[in-house]
Amino acid sequence: MSMVEKHQTTTVLQGEITAERVSALEKRLENLEEQLKQISGELPENRISMIVFSGDLDKVLPAFIIATGAAAMGMEASLFFTFWGLNALKKRRDLSGKGFLEKMFAMMMPVGTEGLGLSKMNFFGIGAKLMRVLMKRKQVASLEELAQMAREMGVKIVACQMSMDVLGIKREELWDGIEVGGVATFLAEAAKSKLTLFI
């Protein structure tokens, strides 16, 4: 076999090897692209979901601070208020049509953000009043201002239907424009969220 023939044979073999390798690489690339599509479909969205269980001023306040901060950063934010957290959403107290236990709960629970106490050092409401004075002096937005800001920024606010039923809270007692939903509503939001918090 002459040198020319050897060179031609080598070139043909290299061409076959290169074609096989290119074909194998193309298949691997297709598989990787398919996996990437699948993974990107499973990634959480740019959103945060919070359960607001507490009805304490010093816990509801951070919920609204986080929600407005997230909304300002372009994230979708949702707050799911349940049990004692529902007190923050009350605009009035309505005893009509309620049973004895529901009336007792209604009388013992605060109405609205103004009535929320502190989780520590509340001292029959004095602690909460002092906290509000300090916040005003330090030019920190009040809970009421943050709640209004959150609504204006499109933060989704949901009241837990089951908790409303248990505590005897009527839809008419809560802020206008909020949603009422069950645990499925929260779970649907949380499943798509980057962050989920329990406050």
Which role does the model predict for each range below?
Residues 97-135, 139:
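A glycine-rich helix N-cap at a beta->alpha junction
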Residues 50-61, 134-135:
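Short, glycine-rich nucleotide/cofactor-binding loops
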Residues 61-79:
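Histidine-anchored nucleotide/phosphate-binding helix
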Residues 159, 164, 172-175, 179-199:
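Glycine-rich, aromatic-bearing surface loops/beta-hairpins
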Residues 145-153, 158:
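A short aromatic-anchored loop/beta-hairpin motif
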Residues 4-45:
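Long, leucine- and charge-enriched amphipathic alpha-helices
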Residues 77-83, 158-161:
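Short internal beta-strands
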Residues 89-98:
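Glycine-rich loop at the start of a catalytic domain that most often binds anionic cofactors/ligands
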